[in-house]
From Swiss-Prot:
The gene is mago. Keywords: Cytoplasm, Developmental protein, mRNA processing, mRNA splicing, mRNA transport, Nucleus, RNA-binding, Transport. Disulfide bonds: none annotated. It is found in: Nucleus; Cytoplasm. This is Protein mago nashi. GO terms for molecular function: RNA binding. GO terms for biological process: import into nucleus; maintenance of pole plasm mRNA location; microtubule cytoskeleton organization; mRNA splicing, via spliceosome; mRNA transport; oocyte microtubule cytoskeleton organization; oocyte microtubule cytoskeleton polarization; oogenesis. SUPFAM superfamilies: Mago nashi protein. It comes from Drosophila melanogaster (Fruit fly). Belongs to the mago nashi family.
Length: 147
C-alpha cells in the first residue's frame, strides 16, 4: 500500500461550561500528523502540534485499521451526537472511504447499551488504540531531550 491512498481524521468534543473543548488529530497522505487539543478549563490554551511520521508508522496505522475491521461497520444504529458531545472518524484507504459520527462514549457500559454493541465496540477499541498511538508519537516527538 502506498501512502497516497491513506487519510485518517478523528475528532471528539463538546460545547459546554468552558466553551468548545475538543481533541482532533489527522494523518495526511504525505505522513503529516496534525494534532489539536483545546480545553478552556482554568484558562488553558489550545495545543497544536504538527510532525511528519515515517512510512512505517503510516503502514502500521493502516494495519491497525484493517485488523479492526472498522471499514465493514455502519454508524446508522449508533447513538447520534448529543449535548454530551460528538465523535467523528474519517478514514480513506485505497478507494474505500468511511465516515462515522456518534456521541461521546464514556465507557464500555455505554457501548453495551447501544443498539449495535458489536459495531460500536469495534469503533471504541480502535479509537482507544489510535489515541494511544497519537499521544505516544506527540509525546516522543516534542518531549525527548537530546543527550
Amino acid at each position: 500500500m502506498s501512502t497516497e491512498d491513506f487519510y485518517l481524521r478523528y475528532y471528539v468534543g463538546h460545547k459546554g461550561k468552558f466553551g468548545h473543548e475538543f481533541l482532533e488529530f489527522e494523518f495526511r497522505p504525505d505522513g503529516k500528523l496534525r494534532y489539536a487539543n483545546n480545553s478552556n478549563y482554568k484558562n488553558d490554551t489550545m495545543i497544536r502540534k504538527e510532525a511528519f511520521v515515517h512510512q512505517s508508522v503510516m503502514e502500521e496505522l493502516k494495519r491497525i485499521i484493517i485488523d479492526s475491521e472498522i471499514m465493514q461497520e455502519d454508524d446508522l444504529p449508533w447513538p447520534p451526537p448529543d449535548r454530551v458531545g460528538r465523535q467523528e472518524l474519517e478514514i480513506v484507504i485505497g478507494d474505500e472511504h468511511i465516515s462515522f459520527t456518534t456521541s461521546k462514549t464514556g465507557s464500555l457500559v455505554d457501548v453495551n447499551r447501544s443498539k449495535d454493541p458489536e459495531g460500536l465496540r469495534c469503533f471504541y477499541y480502535l479509537v482507544q488504540d489510535l489515541k494511544c498511538l497519537v499521544f505516544s508519537l506527540i509525546g516522543l516527538h516534542f518531549k525527548i531531550k537530546p543527550i
